[in-house]
């Protein structure tokens, strides 16, 4: 009886596999149902990313640095996503919040780490350390396999149309104001030159760090932009008082109980 039932089921499935039209229709139906189950709930959610106080769009200089970061492939070896595991929190700091990537296009979470995670590297090291590390990585981290990026200190920062970059980002949801866009070129140059008139740059971009980043105040280089970007990472949101941090630090992970 069992063998007969199994044979019947097999024959029925064989007919389904041989009928391309029926198989395609059923496959489409299953995919459609799965898509509805995944997508439908989003229509009842006001925002999939919870807003966090302190988040702001990148300054033009930070954005230029981020573009260089992507251009040079830094994201291939460095993630920007600290997972909510005790070992990662103890090494890198508070786990990453979704809101911290809300203005990233594309995001820089990363899927592997050849080097350390950089989500909270901002203000962890001095500008001089970053410059030296980028010029000659093994002079500060002997075991590093990172290539040298000394050419960044010699390359003048060239952004053909800063305002157009910010305008494009505004089209995909980054809330740059008309004033931000109009002052983009001035803001980019002023942030790396402490002697320049930065106007209301600090007011429009809270916590923006205004100084010479590469040690050469006479010009703005690609090194200035990249270091400005690195020094900003993880500094916008105050996570020191987050209850989740205390909870994570106080509870044993799976497998630790009883040790």
Predicted regions and their residues:
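Post-cleavage N-terminal segment of exported redox proteins
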Residues: 1-58, 194-199, 203-204, 229-259
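Short pre-active-site segment immediately N-terminal to redox-active cysteine/selenocysteine motifs
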Residues: 72-76, 81, 114-117, 145
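Electron-transfer interface patches adjacent to heme c in soluble/periplasmic c-type cytochromes
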Residues: 23-32, 90-222, 259
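A mature extracytoplasmic/lumenal domain signature
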Residues: 81, 148-152, 231
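The canonical Cys-X-X-Cys-His
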Residues: 65, 71-80, 130, 226, ...
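Sequence context of c-type cytochrome heme-c attachment sites
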Residues: 41-64, 79, 94-108
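Electrostatic cytochrome c docking/interface patches
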Residues: 46-70, 82-85, 89, 114, ...
């Amino acid at each position: 009886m069992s063998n007969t039932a199994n044979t019947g089921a097999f024959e029925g499935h064989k007919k389904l596999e041989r009928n391309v039209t029926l198989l395609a229709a059923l496959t489409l139906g299953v995919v459609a149902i799965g898509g509805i189950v995944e997508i439908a709930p989003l229509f009842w959610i006001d925002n999939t990313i919870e807003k966090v106080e302190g988040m702001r769009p990148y300054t033009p200089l930070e954005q230029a640095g981020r573009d260089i970061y992507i251009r040079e492939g830094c994201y291939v070896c460095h993630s920007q996503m600290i997972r909510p595991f005790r070992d990662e929190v103890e090494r890198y700091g508070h786990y990453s919040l979704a809101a911290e990537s809300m203005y990233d296009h594309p995001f820089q979470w990363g899927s592997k780490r050849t080097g350390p995670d950089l989500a909270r590297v901002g203000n962890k090291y001095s500008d001089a350390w970053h410059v030296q590390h980028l010029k000659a990585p093994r002079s500060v981290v002997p075991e590093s396999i990172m290539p040298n990026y000394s050419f960044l200190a010699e390359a003048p920062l060239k952004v053909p149309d800063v305002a157009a970059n910010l305008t494009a980002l505004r089209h995909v949801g980054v809330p740059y104001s008309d004033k931000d866009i109009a002052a983009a070129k001035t803001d980019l140059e002023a942030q790396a030159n402490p002697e320049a008139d930065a106007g209301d740059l600090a007011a429009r971009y809270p916590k923006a760090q205004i100084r010479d980043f590469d040690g050469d105040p006479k010009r703005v280089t690609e090194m200035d932009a990249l270091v400005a970007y690195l020094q900003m990472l993880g500094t916008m949101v105050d996570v020191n008082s987050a209850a989740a941090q205390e909870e994570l630090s106080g509870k044993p992970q799976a497998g630790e109980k009883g040790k």
